[in-house]
A protein has these predicted regions:
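Short glycine-/polar-rich loops that comprise or flank the Walker A/P-loop
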Residues: 90-92
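Short linear sequence motifs
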Residues: 9, 17, 114-117
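Intrinsic disorder/low-complexity segments enriched in polar/small residues
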Residues: 3-6, 13, 26, 119
């Protein structure tokens, strides 16, 4: 007879991962609003079309200087593949990645990084 997996060994369901991703989108949207981008919302709440274009955060006022895709994953996001799927080319495209690592029974953040084109990075340095 096979042993059943204990709760700590169970693989997280798709719904769990999806909800964790949604919470991360909401968190980053709030952080951007706190920085003065008061019209930033998640694309899930604003525009299915933008969500389909790989844009997770929408700035209804247009002040945000880039398109943002958020990733809350263990593996490194494939920046170039994700960017290629976004048909919007009028603003730079960035990925904010919240690296997940196993911490005892659950996954937690190892830190957050931004992945962007070098020219957009240099643009910020020149300000």
């Amino acid at each position: 007879m096979k042993k059943q997996k204990t709760t700590s060994q169970k693989r997280k369901t798709g719904a769990y991962c999806r909800n964790k991703g949604h919470r991360y989108e909401t968190k980053i949207a709030q952080e951007l609003r706190n920085l003065g981008f008061t019209d930033v919302v998640t694309s899930r709440s604003e525009s299915k079309s933008m969500d389909d274009k790989k844009v997770d955060l929408v700035d209804r006022s247009g002040k945000l200087p880039c398109y943002i895709q958020l990733k809350n994953t263990v593996n490194t996001p494939q920046y170039h593949a994700i960017k290629k799927e976004c048909p919007l080319k009028d603003k730079p495209f960035i990925v904010i990645w919240n690296k997940q690592v196993k911490k005892e029974k659950v996954f937690g953040s190892a830190g957050e990084v931004v992945i962007m084109d070098k020219n957009f990075f240099f643009f910020f340095l020149s300000k």
